[in-house]
Curated annotation (Swiss-Prot):
GO terms for cellular component: endoplasmic reticulum; plastid. The active site is at residues 512, 515, 588. It catalyses: Hydrolysis of terminal (1->3)-alpha-D-glucosidic links in (1->3)-alpha-D-glucans. Keywords: Endoplasmic reticulum, Glycoprotein, Glycosidase, Hydrolase, Plant defense, Signal. It is an enzyme of class 3 (hydrolase). This is Probable glucan 1,3-alpha-glucosidase.
C-alpha cells in the first residue's frame, strides 16, 4: 500500500509538471549559496598577485600568492598554480588549480574527453617570457607570443590576464580579472562544528568537500553584443542580467535540467550547458571565451555602469562588455579566442572541442515522431499515409511505449511482436526507424540489463555508496555511470544485434532524459552528492553526464556496424563536444507562436557554440497547434538543420494530412522545399564537419560590419547563400525583411530581385515564408520528388546561379555515399562552380586520390539576373549546344505564378563529377 501511494504521488507530480513549468521547483541564484556568495563580491576584492614565473614544458607557469601574508590561525590562503599555454590559430589556454604539492584534501575534477587529441599537436612551445611594466604598476608584467598579430599578458599586481593586439594602440581583445572579482574557494578539511550541508526544499546536500566555488570577471573589447552560453530560451544577443536598468536580475544558469514547457525570454537553464561566449562589435571583429567545466555555472552579463567607480580607462571610441562567471566546483580551464573574423572564432573553438560529425544523408531529411505510435499497425498506416499524400520522409520514431514496461532494448510483445519485419518494410522504401533509449534503468531483478549492471557495479552510487535509486518513467530506477570508459564500452555493446534483439541495420537511437532526469530528485535531477567512479561527486560532472551517455550510445552504433556506417543518435542534454556524436533538439517546447519565434535564436546560439545539427519540435511538443501555426512552423522548420515533427501523447494527432486539404498542401510544399535543397544542406553539413562553421548562421556571420544584423534573430542564413525570414505572428500576410549587404537578393519563390542594405516590406502569403538567395552564389538542388532521400540518389541536379552586379557567382557541391565512413578515406566528390564572363565552370576541389564517381547529370542550370538575351549555350568538352528557355522560376515541382522570367539551360548533359564548361552564346 505504501509503495502504491508513492507511485500515485509520483504520477501526480509528473502530470502536474507536464502542465507547466514551475519556477519554484528550481533554484534561483539567491537559493544557490555559491552564486549568492560570488554575486556579493565587490570589484577589486581579489587579493592575489603573480609570482615565481617560469617556462616549464613550453608553458608559462606561475604561482598566485596572497598579496598580504597570512595572519593568525584562521583560514590560510595557499598558493594556486597558474599555467598559460599558447596554440596555433590564436588560442590561449589558462588553467588555475590548487597546488598539489601542498596535498589538498582531494584532487579537483578536470573534465576529460572534451578537448580533442589533435589540439595538443597545435601547441606552440614557449621559449621565453618578455617583461613589461604597465603604467601605474609597481611590478612588471609577463608577455608571451600568441601569433604574429597577438600576444598574451599576465599582469602580476594586480593579477590579470588578457590578450591584446601587437600593433597600433595594442587593443585588448579578451581579459580575465580586469575588475578584481577573481575568487577561488580552496578545499579544506572538515573540523568539528563545521556544517557544510545545504538544503533546497525537501532535499539535503551533504557537500562532503565543503565550499569549492570559483568566480571571475571576463571582459570583451570592441564589443556591441555577446552571444552563446546555451541553453536558454532567450534572445540571440544576450541581455544584461545585472546593473542599471536590468529587469530580470538573475544570471544565465548553466545546469542541465529536465524542464517541462519552459518559459521563453528566461535566463534559467534548460537541458544543456555550453560555457562558450562570443563577442562581436562595430569594428566587425569577433572574439570568444570558453570555460571547460562540468559543474553548475551561473553567468552575469553586466550592464553599462554596473559599477561606476570600477573599470579600465579606455579611449572613448572603444566599447567593452563585462561578464561575471561563477561555478560551484572544478578548476579554471579557460580558452581565449582572438578571432578576428566570426568564422575564425567558431573554427578556433572547433579546434578545441571538435567539429560536427558528418551525418548520414537520411538524417538531414524529415523525421516523423510522436509519443507514441501505438503499435505496428499504427506505424504501417502512418507510413502509407505519407505515400498516399505524396509527402517524403526518412525516419519514423518510437517513444518509450514501444518497450516492455519501459525496459530499454526490449519490445512490447503485444504491440510490437515483429519489430524486425516492421523495420524492414520501412527500409524497403529507403526509410529508417529510431527508438528511444534513456539512461534510467528499471530496477527489476528479472530485467537482464539491470541484473548485469548491478552485478558489474556499473551504476552511479548515492552518498552512502549504494546504487543510487531514483524515480523516472519505469518507476524505481538506477543510472549507468557514464564517467567510466569501461562502463561506456559495455554500454555500447548493448546495441549489438545479439544484445538488442529485434534491432536491424536501419534502426537508430534517441537519448532523452539524459540531463539526467530524476523525478523525485532535487530540481528533477540527480543529487549533487551522488558518487561516480573514482569518488567524483555528481556536482563536479553533472553537466557532462548526458554528453558521456550520448558518446557511449554513438560509439555503440559504430561498433554495431564494425566501424562501417555512421551512427545517428539524438540527444537532449548537451555539453561542449556533443557535436561530435550527433544531433540535438531544443526539448519540450509548446504549441505557441512565441515558442516558434524563440526557436530561431536558440538554434542560432547552438550553431554558434558548435552544435550545428539542431532543431525544435515542429508544432510544439505540448498543446495542440492551430493549423496556421503548424503550417508556419513547417515552413520555418524546413530550414532547421534537424527537421522533426513531434508531440506529447495527450495532444491530438497532427500528421500533415489531418488539417484539411489546403493545409496538407502547404505542409507538403514546405517538406518538399527541404528535400529540394538536400544537396545544399548536405554540402553545408560537410563544411561544418571540416571547419565547424554552422549550417544555420546569424546574419552578422556573413555580414560582420552591418550593425543592423547584430541583434536580428528572426531572420537567419542557411550557409552563405540563403536568407530566411520566419513568420511568427498569427494572421500575418506581410513581413518586414532586412536584406544585408550591397548586392541584390533573389526571392526563392519567383526570382524577383531586391536590393541589399535596406528593409523591405513584402507579402508573406500562406503559401510560403520569405526566403532569398544571395546574389553571387550558386546553390545545388534536386527537383524530383521521391519517397525518401535515398530514392533521390541517382536523380539529376539543378544549379541555381544567382548573378551579382558583376554578372558572377560561385558555389560548391559535396557528395559521398551518404552513409559510411569511406569519405574519410577520400571517397567523395567535391566540386566548385564558378560563373564569370558568361561561362559556368565546374572544377574539382577533392584531393587527387578522391575516387568516388557518379553518373548523375546536371539537368537544369537556372540563371537569375542574367542581363542579356542569349539564344544558346555551348557545352565543353562535349562540343554540343544545350537548349535555353526563358520562363517562370521552378522550385522542385512548383512553378512561380508570377515574377521575373529567368533563363534556364535545359539538359546540358554534363556529369556532376567531371570538369566541364557551359558558355552562354
Amino acid at each position: 500500500m505504501r509503495s502504491l501511494l508513492f507511485v500515485l504521488s509520483l504520477i501526480c507530480f509528473c502530470s502536474q509538471t507536464a502542465l507547466s513549468w514551475k519556477k519554484e521547483e528550481f533554484r534561483s541564484c539567491d537559493q544557490t549559496p555559491f552564486c549568492k556568495r560570488a554575486r556579493s563580491r565587490t570589484p577589486g576584492a581579489c587579493s592575489l598577485i603573480v609570482g615565481d614565473v617560469s617556462i616549464t614544458d613550453g608553458d608559462l607557469v606561475a604561482k598566485l600568492l596572497p598579496k598580504a601574508p597570512n595572519q593568525g590561525d584562521g583560514d590560510q590562503i595557499k598558493p594556486l598554480i597558474l599555467s598559460l599555454s599558447v596554440y596555433k590559430d590564436g588560442i590561449v589556454r589558462l588553467k588555475i588549480d590548487e597546488d598539489h604539492s601542498l596535498n589538498p584534501p582531494k584532487k579537483r575534477f578536470q573534465v576529460p574527453d572534451v578537448v580533442v587529441s589533435e589540439f595538443e599537436e597545435k601547441k606552440i612551445w614557449l621559449q621565453k617570457v618578455a617583461t613589461e611594466t604597465i603604467s601605474g604598476d609597481t611590478s612588471p608584467s609577463s608577455v608571451v607570443y600568441v601569433s604574429d598579430g597577438y600576444e598574451a599578458v599576465v599582469r602580476h599586481d594586480p593579477f590579470e590576464v588578457y590578450v591584446r593586439e601587437k600593433s597600433g594602440d595594442r587593443r585588448r581583445v579578451v581579459s580575465l580579472n580586469s575588475h578584481g572579482l577573481f575568487d577561488f574557494e580552496q578545499l579544506g578539511r572538515k573540523t568539528e562544528g563545521d556544517n557544510w550541508e545545504e538544503k533546497f526544499r525537501t532535499h539535503t546536500d551533504s557537500r562532503p568537500s565543503g565550499p569549492q566555488s570559483i568566480s571571475f570577471d571576463v571582459s570583451f573589447y570592441d564589443s556591441s553584443f555577446v552571444y552563446g552560453i546555451p541553453e536558454h530560451a532567450t534572445s540571440f544577443a544576450l541581455k544584461p542580467t545585472k546593473g542599471p536598468g536590468v529587469e530580470e536580475s538573475e544570471p544565465y544558469r548553466l545546469f542541465n535540467l529536465d524542464v517541462f514547457e519552459y518559459d521563453h525570454e528566461s535566463p534559467f537553464g534548460l537541458y544543456g550547458s555550453i560555457p562558450f561566449m562570443v563577442s562581436h562589435g562595430k569594428s566587425g571583429k569577433t572574439s570568444g571565451f570558453f570555460w571547460l567545466n562540468a559543474a553548475e555555472m551561473q553567468i552575469d552579463v553586466l550592464a553599462n555602469g554596473w559599477d561606476a567607480e570600477s573599470g579600465i580607462s579606455l579611449p572613448s571610441s572603444h566599447s567593452r562588455i563585462d561578464t561575471f562567471w561563477m561555478s560551484e566546483a572544478g578548476i579554471v580551464d579557460t580558452f581565449f579566442f582572438v578571432g578576428p573574423e566570426p568564422k575564425d572564432v567558431v573554427k578556433q573553438y572547433a579546434s578545441v572541442t571538435g567539429t560536427s560529425a558528418m551525418p548520414q544523408l537520411f538524417a538531414t531529411g524529415y523525421h516523423q515522431c510522436r509519443w507514441n505510435y501505438k503499435d505496428e499497425e499504427d506505424v504501417a498506416q502512418v507510413d502509407s499515409k505519407f505515400d498516399e499524400h505524396d509527402i517524403p520522409y526518412d525516419v519514423l520514431w518510437l517513444d518509450i511505449e514501444h518497450t516492455d514496461g519501459k525496459r530499454y532494448f526490449t519490445w512490447d510483445s503485444v504491440l510490437f511482436p515483429h519489430p524486425e519485419e516492421m523495420q524492414k518494410k520501412l527500409a524497403a522504401k529507403g526509410r529508417k526507424m529510431v527508438t528511444i533509449v534513456d539512461p534510467h534503468i528499471k530496477r527489476d531483478d528479472s530485467y537482464f540489463l539491470h541484473k548485469e549492471a548491478t552485478q558489474m557495479g556499473y551504476y552511479v552510487k548515492d552518498s552512502s555508496g549504494k546504487d543510487f535509486d531514483g524515480w523516472c518513467w519505469p518507476g524505481s530506477s538506477s543510472y549507468i555511470d557514464m564517467l567510466s570508459p569501461e562502463i561506456r564500452k559495455w554500454w555500447g555493446g548493448r546495441f549489438s544485434y545479439k544484445n538488442y534483439v529485434g534491432s536491424t541495420p536501419s534502426l537508430y537511437t534517441w537519448n532523452d532524459m539524459n540531463e539526467p532526469s530524476v523525478f523525485n530528485g532535487p530540481e528533477v535531477t540527480m543529487p549533487r552528492d551522488a558518487l561516480h567512479v573514482g569518488g567524483v561527486e555528481h556536482r563536479e560532472v553533472h553537466n557532462a553526464y548526458g554528453y558521456y551517455f550520448h558518446m557511449a550510445t554513438s560509439d555503440g552504433l559504430v561498433m554495431r556496424e564494425e566501424g562501417k556506417d555512421r551512427p545517428f543518435v539524438l540527444s537532449r542534454a548537451i555539453f561542449p563536444g556533443t557535436q561530435r556524436y550527433g544531433a540535438i533538439w531544443t526539448g519540450d517546447n509548446t504549441a505557441e507562436w512565441e515558442h516558434l519565434r524563440v526557436s530561431i535564436p536558440m538554434i542560432l546560439t547552438l550553431g554558434l557554440t558548435g552544435i550545428t545539427f539542431s532543431g525544435a519540435d515542429i508544432g510544439g511538443f505540448f498543446g495542440n497547434p492551430e493549423p496556421e501555426l503548424l503550417v508556419r512552423w513547417y515552413q520555418v522548420g524546413a530550414y532547421y538543420p534537424f527537421f522533426r515533427g513531434h508531440a506529447h501523447h495527450d495532444t491530438k494527432r497532427r500528421e500533415p494530412w489531418l488539417f484539411g486539404e489546403r493545409n496538407t498542401e502547404l505542409m507538403r510544399d514546405a517538406i518538399h522545399t527541404r528535400y529540394t535543397l538536400l544537396p545544399y544542406f548536405y554540402t553545408l553539413f560537410r563544411e561544418a564537419n571540416v571547419t565547424g562553421v554552422p549550417v544555420v548562421r546569424p546574419l552578422w556571420m556573413e555580414f560582420p560590419q552591418d550593425e543592423a544584423t547584430f541583434s536580428n534573430d528572426e531572420a537567419f542564413m542557411v550557409g552563405s547563400g540563403l536568407l530566411v525570414q520566419g513568420v511568427y505572428t498569427k494572421g500575418t500576410t506581410q513581413a518586414s525583411v532586412y536584406l544585408p549587404g550591397k548586392e541584390s537578393w533573389y526571392d526563392l519563390r519567383n526570382g524577383k530581385t531586391y536590393v541589399g542594405g535596406k528593409t523591405h516590406k513584402m507579402d508573406a502569403p500562406e503559401e510560403s515564408i520569405p526566403a532569398f538567395q544571395k546574389a553571387g552564389t550558386i546553390i545545388p538542388r534536386k527537383d524530383r520528388f521521391r519517397r525518401s532521400s535515398s530514392q533521390m540518389d541517382n536523380d539529376p541536379y539543378t544549379l541555381v546561379v544567382a548573378l551579382n552586379s558583376s554578372q558572377e557567382a560561385e558555389g560548391e557541391l559535396y557528395i559521398d555515399d551518404g552513409k559510411s565512413f569511406e569519405f574519410r578515406r577520400g571517397s567523395y566528390i567535391h566540386r566548385r562552380f564558378v560563373f564569370s564572363k558568361g561561362v559556368l565552370t565546374s572544377t574539382n576541389l577533392a584531393p587527387p586520390e578522391a575516387r568516388l564517381s557518379s553518373q548523375c547529370l546536371i539537368d537544369r542550370i537556372i540563371l537569375l539576373g542574367h542581363s542579356s538575351g542569349p539564344k544558346s549555350a555551348l557545352v565543353e568538352p562535349l562540343n554540343q549546344k544545350a537548349e535555353i528557355e526563358m520562363g517562370p522560376l521552378r522550385m522542385g515541382g512548383l512553378v512561380a505564378s508570377s515574377g521575373t522570367k529567368v533563363l534556364t539551360i535545359r539538359k546540358p548533359g554534363v556529369r556532376v563529377d567531371q570538369d566541364w564548361t557551359v558558355k552562354i552564346l
